[in-house]
Design a protein with these regions (language model features):
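Sec-dependent N-terminal signal peptides
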Residues: 4-12
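Phosphate-group recognition and catalysis centered on beta-loop-alpha active-site segments
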Residues: 14-322
Length: 322
């Protein structure tokens, strides 16, 4: 497809308010991930959606954390020192204990810290409850902000999290209690969780996460019997990821950006799927995703996505500072 046609289609989508700029874990490249200061930073930049990860503590508290156990690269204990190894498993720990840890700073000298040189520390930041994020987006002027909530479960370590179905139920109940069904999507790499959400809460959108890389592959193309991640929708039967998601009743595909090309984007959109690309932080890759015609970008640096949209003369979400 000629580039001018791709840009024209993208411009039309943006003008219709369809393009989705998501702040990944808040704005991980600018502020500590999955913290209230991080979400405030994303809102100050201007995003359509706040993306975050959901975990459940031993006493049933829904909280925000990407990892099943506290990550030593971002976590300091009550003594103020960084953890020297993997921290407590969240599913095995009460929330009051988890709240004692400080997650407001990257551990110097780590490879993880090297990925985010622009991140500004926020000492004293704690693992927030999901209800605190709900309160943030209910504030005046933030009524249009959406939430993308990832259910963090895995078939490869089932003892470290709540099981997919009860996890989905707990999250759905919380979203409904907050009255945020129309502003929320629920996403997961483990499609069992998404099937559960679709069965119990058809009013809440689901997002099918995928990656097909050597380091992690939840699709398992060519794997006998299919992947444990895809809830009985094997690649061998459907022939492509968009067709798998369509068969599963999905409406949104969120793919690792390195797996996407124009043919896959066009195939998915022809099936009626919305296509998101994650996690896109490099300016050249941001430009490439826009050229492919994706419907949204998930980024640790939403400011850089905003800059590229501005450079192209396209609209971007408004800033919503406190």
């Amino acid at each position: 497809m000629p580039r001018w046609i791709t840009l024209a289609l993208l411009c039309t989508a943006l003008q219709a308010g369809a393009f989705d700029l998501q702040g990944h874990r808040g704005a991980r490249g600018l502020a500590p991930e999955n913290t209230l200061p991080g979400f405030e930073r994303a809102l100050a930049v201007g995003v359509t959606t706040l993306e975050t990860d959901i975990a459940i503590s031993a006493d049933g508290v829904l909280l925000l954390s990407h990892d099943p156990a506290l990550n030593p690269d971002i976590t300091r204990g009550p003594d103020g020192q960084f953890l020297t190894g993997r921290g407590p498993v969240i599913w095995h720990s009460p929330y009051a204990e988890l709240r004692r840890y400080d997650v407001g700073r990257l551990k110097p000298g780590t490879r993880y810290a090297a990925q985010f040189p622009a991140q500004q520390p926020q000492d004293g930041a704690r693992l927030p409850k999901l209800e605190e994020l709900f309160a943030l987006v209910r504030q005046p002027g933030r009524e249009g902000v959406r939430l993308a909530l990832e259910i963090k479960v895995t078939p490869t370590a089932p003892d470290e999290t709540q099981a997919p179905e009860p996890f989905a139920r707990a999250l759905v109940d919380a979203v409904r209690a907050a009255g945020l069904q129309q502003r929320t999507t629920i996403l997961s790499f483990d499609w069992r969780a998404l099937q559960a959400v679709q069965a119990i809460a058809p009013e809440i959108g689901t997002v099918y996460l995928t990656i097909q890389q050597r380091s992690f592959d939840n699709i398992g193309a060519g794997k006998p019997g299919g992947s444990a991640w895809t809830a009985g929708f094997p690649h061998a039967e459907y022939g492509s990821v968009p067709k798998m998601i369509h068969a599963a009743g999905g409406r949104v595909w969120s793919s690792f950006h390195g797996d996407l090309d124009v043919a896959k984007v066009k195939e998915a959109q022809a099936l009626g799927l919305t296509v998101l690309a994650w996690t896109v932080n490099d300016p050249a890759q941001i430009a490439r995703m826009l050229d492919l015609g994706v419907d949204g970008i998930v980024s640790d640096r939403p400011d850089l996505v905003r800059d590229e949209l501005q450079r192209r003369g396209l609209p971007w979400p408004p800033a919503r500072p406190r």
